[in-house]
Swiss-Prot record:
Subunit description: Homohexamer; trimer of dimers.
EC number(s) from the headed UniProt entry: 4.1.2.20
Reactions performed catalytically: 5-dehydro-4-deoxy-D-glucarate = 2-hydroxy-3-oxopropanoate + pyruvate; 2-dehydro-3-deoxy-D-glucarate = 2-hydroxy-3-oxopropanoate + pyruvate
Binding-site list for Mg(2+): E153, D179
Family: Belongs to the HpcH/HpaI aldolase family. KDGluc aldolase subfamily.
Active site: H50
Function field: Catalyzes the reversible retro-aldol cleavage of both 5-keto-4-deoxy-D-glucarate and 2-keto-3-deoxy-D-glucarate to pyruvate and tartronic semialdehyde.
Entry keywords, A to Z: Lyase, Magnesium, Metal-binding
Protein name listed in UniProt: 5-keto-4-deoxy-D-glucarate aldolase
Length: 256
């Protein structure tokens, strides 16, 4: 049986430096995720760090995206091999790893997604991703079809951006603007010049190592500026933000 995740088109698009416009999925609901999957985004982040998601909520969302052209990307709650292994087994193959500060942490993230001898991923012969054992070449194809995006959101991460970006197996560098702003002493103000300078520096250093860079930018002017700075995978909003804004606008139209 063929596995429709191979080849990984999102990974290939990143490697080719093709602009990929994405959206955040934070409502943890398969219907809202299915609607996002119909909108035409290149990729969607299913958030396991700041949204109320777990294995039981991720599976129906992956099912809802089965016919979508939007690539599902999971942001794991933490860079931990067992968590990553379980997410691999339920159907994810694109990973966003939060709060990576060193080359060693980047290497651990990569190793967690690779079968031995390249990594430490535990082996199950039957799970959702290999269609419960019916994909004959899954083991041969898996390692080279996993996407690892590491998130830089601290001063230490900025200081080590060159080593992180140069790590074999890291496919892209993602900036966490809110946590980065907090780490630089500007909590709640990612627009501060110091934060913007750090973001542009991260983009530049990622590019110097041949790696694409990305960011979450729900404000259009910010998203367009980051694209001009060279970011290629940009999430331009979230389901939660769009829902809140639209419902507030609708209520205001009739209540004011």
């Amino acid at each position: 049986m063929n596995n429709d995740v191979f080849p990984n088109k999102f990974k290939a698009a990143l490697a080719a430096k093709q602009v990929q416009i994405g959206c955040w999925s934070a409502l943890s609901n398969p219907i809202s995720t299915e609607v996002l999957g119909l909108a035409g985004f290149d990729w969607l982040v299913l958030d396991g760090e700041h949204a109320p998601n777990d294995i039981s909520t991720f599976i129906p969302q992956l099912m809802a995206l089965k016919g979508s052209a939007s690539a599902p990307v999971v942001r794991v709650p933490t860079n931990e091999p067992v968590i990553i292994k379980r997410l691999l087994d339920i159907g994810f193959y694109n990973f966003l790893i939060p709060f990576v500060e060193t080359k060693e942490e980047a290497e651990q993230a990569v190793a967690s997604t690779r079968y031995p001898p390249e990594g430490i991923r535990g082996v199950s012969v039957s799970h959702r991703t290999n269609m419960f054992g019916t994909v004959a070449d899954y083991f041969a194809q898996s390692n080279k079809n996993i996407t690892i995006l590491v998130q830089i959101e601290s001063q230490q991460g900025v200081d080590n951006v060159d080593a992180i970006a140069a790590t074999e197996g890291v496919d892209g560098i993602f900036v966490g603007p809110s946590d980065l702003a907090a780490a630089l002493g500007h909590l709640g103000n990612a627009s501060h010049p110091d934060v913007q300078k750090a973001i542009q520096h991260i983009f530049n250093r990622a590019s110097a190592h041949g790696k694409p860079s990305g960011i979450l930018a729900p404000v259009e002017a910010d998203a367009r500026r980051y694209l001009e700075w060279g970011a290629t995978f940009v999430a331009v909003g979230s389901d939660l933000g769009v829902f809140r804004s639209a419902t507030q606008k609708l209520a205001d139209t009739f209540k004011k």
